[in-house]
Swiss-Prot record:
Enzyme class, UniProt record, top EC level: ligase
Organism per entry: Halalkalibacterium halodurans (strain ATCC BAA-125 / DSM 18197 / FERM 7344 / JCM 9153 / C-125) (Bacillus halodurans)
Protein name per Swiss-Prot or TrEMBL: Phosphoribosylaminoimidazole-succinocarboxamide synthase
Disulfide bonding pattern of the chain: none
Gene: purC
Pfam families: SAICAR_synt (PF01259)
Length: 237
């Protein structure tokens, strides 16, 4: 397997073509961003941490019957994935009120939800990735009704699996963002990454933050928080 030309570069990853049809080479970056790219920094070791954590979580989800684009870990900062066409929606699952939801509805951060809340955000940097309803999604033609129904089911399946996974390492899964893609034959796969960049992760006993809020809100050292998550996962394995 060889890495060929750069296909796409985003805020946190570079994606390259390979010499095998349908497979892409992902290289994680040390960059950290928040507030739609308004806050930026380069953090040594972040690429390794996100790649290692995401690789381990995707492998766990596969064991739980959740299909994703992840094929295998290639190095500390690289992984191999199936090529998919990304559905332009971020699917956010919330178990505890935090972040923008707390501001939007005026309920104190940290309040548990009686059942998981699934939200959709339209992936458009110029618009600031706005919260959208299913009717908005239809108007935007971002996904079909059938696809939206599938995304909701898959999001709850992932939430059930990850809630158990993180509880096993003493971490509360507050909320998280998922992305999905469509394969050439029409299958919908979990895509992007699952890491402290995309999840709010609090220590189950102390409430200590181990996620990107450390950077976003200047709450502490991001590298230390992510390292704590990786260490706990590796100790459990």
């Amino acid at each position: 397997m060889e890495k060929h030309d750069l296909l796409y570069e985003g805020k946190a990853k570079k994606i390259y073509r390979t010499d095998e049809e349908g497979l892409l080479w992902v290289e994680y970056k040390n960059s950290a961003t928040a507030f739609n790219g308004e806050k930026k920094a380069s953090i040594e070791g972040k690429a390794r941490l996100n790649n290692e954590i995401s690789s381990l979580i995707f492998s766990y989800l596969k064991e739980q019957g959740v299909d994703s684009h992840f094929v295998k870990r290639l190095s500390e900062t690289e992984q191999l994935i199936h090529q998919v066409t990304i559905i332009p929606l971020e699917v956010v699952v919330r178990n505890v009120i935090a972040g923008s939801l707390a501001k939007r509805i005026g309920i104190e951060e940290g309040t548990p939800l009686e059942k998981p809340l699934v939200e959709f955000y339209y992936k458009d940097d110029d618009l600031g990735d706005p919260l959208v309803t299913e009717d908005h999604i239809a108007i935007l033609q971002a996904a079909t009704k059938e696809q939206v129904d599938i995304l909701k089911v898959k999001a709850i399946e992932v939430n059930d699996a990850l809630t158990t996974f993180f509880a096993g390492i003493g971490v509360k899964l507050v909320d998280f963002k998922l992305e999905f893609g469509v394969t050439a034959d029409g299958a919908i796969l979990l895509a992007d990454e699952i890491s402290p960049d995309t999840c709010r992760l609090w220590d189950a006993k102390t409430g200590e933050r181990f996620d990107k809020d450390l950077f976003r809100r200047n709450l502490g050292n991001l590298q230390d928080g992510y390292e704590q998550i990786l260490t706990r996962i590796e100790q459990k394995a």
